[in-house]
Amino acid sequence: MLDLSVIIVTRNTCQLTCAAIESVLSGQDSPSREIILVDNGSTDETPAVVAKRYPSVRQFRSERNLGFARANNLAARAAQGQFLLLLNSDAALQPESLAAAVAWMRAHPDCGAAGVQLLNPDGSPQNSIANFPTLATELLNKSLLRRLCPRRYPGKEHRFTEPVEVETVVGAFMIIRRDLWDAIGGLDERYFFFLEETDFCLQTRRLGKRLMHLPQITVWHGQGQTAKKDSPAARIEYWRSRYIYFAKNHRLSVRLTLAIGLLLRLSANCLASGLLAALTLGRSARWKNKWQVNSALGLWHLRGKPQDMGLPR
């Protein structure tokens, strides 16, 4: 059995995907590993370029977008590694990242999965951990929560220097024990994009396994460059995933409170952003974009949350 299976899901991100693959192949003291790429219906040159440049990469091609969870599950079924690494196509490893992550997991068998410190292209830290979604995190301002209660809601302002147990990690780089993956059954395919790794972290904790943040390992991350191509669609997809997460993991009273609170806030945001966009005569890109996002979310709710709105399938 190989030490590690690196799984990358891509869609129309040829240059980013090649950079991610290059970073895996150029690792120092790398464990035995394989790279599995799932192409989620790319219409650019990604499949052909990867096949030509990296013949050792095992590639699965889909004619349509399977979603993040389903694509990773497809690759995992073919994976031969003792550990699985979910790596975003807009992430790039440091030379020592793979060796350090595998070594840490081997030395700590009580750890089921782990994430690392993600960095922006300029080297500044990204939020690499998060809390499980609750009424507080979803209805209140997250930045304010992090400032008022930094221990309860740590963010990128809190720089950890030692490995620490956390609730969830950002799935741009997430190393997972294969036996844990099999016990949970992989990622829940009801999530098309967003929160699938958060739900996996919750199931990890429920099985009594620790989930760790490893700040000593750093990875470059574009922070959702693929999703940013269609902001209203991405926000709709996030809201859909949030409803799925709460329906699966919270009681009815919490779900109702969430829905009422979100709709009240959305109504206020629609009114405010529409008014400010009008007052600036549409010249403010910020308020124009906010109005487009909020109105799209409002229309999605009015139409009954249809599947044909959101990220393309």
List each model region and its residues.
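N-proximal low-complexity "stem/linker" segments adjacent to membrane-targeting elements
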Residues: 1-26
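Short, flexible, basic/aromatic active-site loop/helix in glycosyltransferases
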Residues: 133-167
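A short, conserved alpha-helix in the catalytic core of glycosyltransferases
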Residues: 161, 165-218
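Active-site-adjacent helix/loop segment of glycosyltransferases
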Residues: 7, 206-282
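Conserved donor NDP-sugar-binding/catalytic core segment of glycosyltransferases
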Residues: 92-128
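Glycine-rich, basic loop-to-helix element that forms the pyrophosphate-binding segment
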Residues: 61-79, 100
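Short aromatic/hydrophobic "clamp" motif used to bind/position activated sugar donors
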Residues: 84
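A conserved acidic beta->alpha catalytic loop
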Residues: 23, 39-48, 64, 94
